[in-house]
């Protein structure tokens, strides 16, 4: 047995995927394996999810791969496993992910039992911070469970496995999701009813189940008979131990409200006194985006010429909301829903090509007196005039995302500066290159 393991290690050692050297297998799933990988340039370690295309051929993979991969780049949060790069060969999709070494929260509870309320609340706070961030990006997980909550070396949680088991159904005219997905014990009643549901509300239900397990060590709804299990879920009202604090009991009860309309929201959760005890908000990495240059190639899917990564000098960029779109559990509905929050980030659509858009944007902002720095499909725009407070007038990043060949999204992101000037810039660009009507612009 030992000899066989040594032979397997020798066989695995030296396997290459571009600049990555693949090592031991960390896990296996329905569509492939997860392997340890080391970046031979930086020396950093990663986990590579290797997906066999032949196993998802019946899911219209070739069509769905046209979705926009750059959406994954938006998910930059300390409590969400980071996707660093996606490499595709003729037979495989290779997702280079952040390596999380602490195992599953599920295993910790199975081994050690329930957490104390203080420790459990800390885990729950991190979970809600991560999910709240996803929802703010218009992304809904839809398969939240303890097995999809990992722990890093410091014991902090990392939400993972946004799903690769099936393709999502499209939103219908009612604006609701109609795909029944998720693990039975964690699924919300409205999902089981298959009448359409709000992705955010269903995620809150699943988080409520997770909180219950963290604090009690058992599932709120469980039965070997699926029909009975579904009846329990739809009824709600799980037994809540009296030894939990009133705040914890109230939180569980409000999260496991079978009515999605009256179920507590993320805002309500964060406003509760129980949640706010010793709460230290997690800070997303979004604000670093304007300061740190990111090689766009690191967030594109490159079509390798072979499994070893010896491709042509001009790799094919695969447009893919797809790595999210492939998932029955990860939905992007909110990405294009209007939000009256602030003007820090504005998106609008255009029928022009990405190349033409960048040229037109550069011309327009130059005429307005802005300086421009260009890199890949991104422009960094600055107005150097200082206001009365001595601050630089405005700094904005403009980026183009391809949804399909005849449709692009222009995203403007303000780092700092005058909101009035930012609005003038947006209105000029919308006039010159945009197709969105005022009702279709997305403001976040």
UniProtKB/Swiss-Prot annotation:
Q: Which residues bind ATP?
A: 26-34, 49
Q: Name one GO cellular component term.
A: plasma membrane
Q: Which SUPFAM superfamilies does the annotation name?
A: Protein kinase-like (PK-like)
Q: Which UniProt keywords apply?
A: ATP-binding, Kinase, Nucleotide-binding, Phosphoprotein, Serine/threonine-protein kinase, Transferase
Show the active-site residues.
Answer: 143 (proton acceptor)
GO BP annotations, alphabetical order = response to abscisic acid; response to osmotic stress; response to salt stress; signal transduction
Describe the reaction catalysed, as an equation. Answer: L-seryl-[protein] + ATP = O-phospho-L-seryl-[protein] + ADP + H(+); L-threonyl-[protein] + ATP = O-phospho-L-threonyl-[protein] + ADP + H(+)
What free text does the record give on domains?
A: The activation loop within the kinase domain is the target of phosphorylation/activation by upstream protein kinases. The PPI motif mediates the interaction with the ABI (abscisic acid-insensitive) phosphatases.
Q: Where is this region: PPI?
A: 343-372
Q: Which residues carry this modification: Phosphothreonine?
A: 179
| Annotated spans, Activation loop | 161-190
Protein name (database record): CBL-interacting serine/threonine-protein kinase 1
Q: Which Pfam families match?
A: NAF, Pkinase
Kindly list the organism's lineage: Eukaryota, Viridiplantae, Streptophyta, Embryophyta, Tracheophyta
Q: In which tissues is it expressed?
A: Ubiquitous.
**Known partners and oligomeric status:** Interacts with CBL1. Interacts with CBL2. Interacts with CBL3. Interacts with CBL9. Interacts with ECT1 and ECT2.
């Amino acid at each position: 047995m030992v000899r066989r393991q040594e032979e397997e290690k020798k066989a695995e050692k030296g396997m290459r995927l571009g600049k990555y050297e693949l090592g031991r297998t960390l896990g296996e799933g329905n569509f492939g394996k997860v392997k340890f990988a080391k970046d031979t340039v930086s020396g950093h370690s990663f986990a590579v999810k290797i997906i066999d295309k032949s196993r998802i051929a019946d899911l219209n993979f070739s069509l769905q791969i046209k979705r926009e991969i750059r959406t994954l780049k938006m998910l930059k949060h300390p409590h969400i496993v980071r996707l660093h790069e996606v490499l595709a060969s003729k037979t495989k999709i290779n997702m280079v992910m952040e390596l999380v070494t602490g195992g599953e929260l599920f295993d910790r509870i199975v081994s050690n039992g329930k957490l104390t309320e203080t420790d459990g609340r800390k885990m729950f706070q991190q979970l809600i911070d991560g999910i709240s961030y996803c929802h703010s990006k218009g992304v809904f997980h839809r398969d939240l469970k303890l097995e999809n909550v990992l722990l890093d070396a410091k014991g902090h949680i990392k939400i993972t496995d946004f799903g690769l088991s099936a393709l999502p159904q499209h939103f219908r005219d009612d604006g609701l999701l109609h795909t029944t997905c998720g693990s039975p014990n964690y699924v919300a009643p409205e999902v089981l009813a298959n009448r359409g549901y709000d992705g955010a509300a269903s995620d809150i239900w699943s988080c409520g189940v997770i909180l219950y397990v963290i604090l009690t060590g058992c599932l709120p709804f469980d039965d070997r008979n699926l029909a009975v299990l579904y009846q329990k879920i739809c009824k709600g009202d799980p037994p809540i131990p009296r030894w939990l604090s009133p705040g914890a009991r109230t939180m569980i009860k409000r999260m496991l409200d079978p009515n999605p309309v009256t179920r507590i929201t993320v805002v309500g959760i964060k406003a509760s006194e129980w949640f706010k005890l010793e709460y230290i908000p997690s800070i997303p990495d979004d604000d670093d985006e304007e300061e740190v240059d990111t090689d766009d190639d690191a967030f594109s899917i490159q079509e390798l010429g072979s499994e070893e990564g010896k491709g042509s000098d001009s790799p094919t960029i695969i447009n893919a909301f797809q790595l999210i779109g492939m998932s029955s559990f990860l939905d992007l509905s909110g990405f294009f829903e209007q939000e009256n929050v602030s003007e820090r980030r504005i998106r609008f659509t255009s029928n022009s090509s990405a190349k033409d858009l960048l040229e037109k944007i550069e011309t327009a902002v130059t005429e307005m007196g802005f300086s421009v720095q260009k890199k890949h499909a991104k422009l960094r725009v600055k107005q150097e005039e200082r206001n009365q407070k001595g601050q630089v007038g405005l700094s904005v990043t403009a980026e183009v995302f391809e949804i399909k060949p005849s449709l692009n999204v222009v995203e403007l992101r303000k780092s700092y500066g005058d909101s009035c000037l930012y609005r003038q810039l947006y209105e000029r660009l919308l006039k010159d290159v945009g197709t969105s009507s005022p009702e279709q612009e997305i403001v976040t």
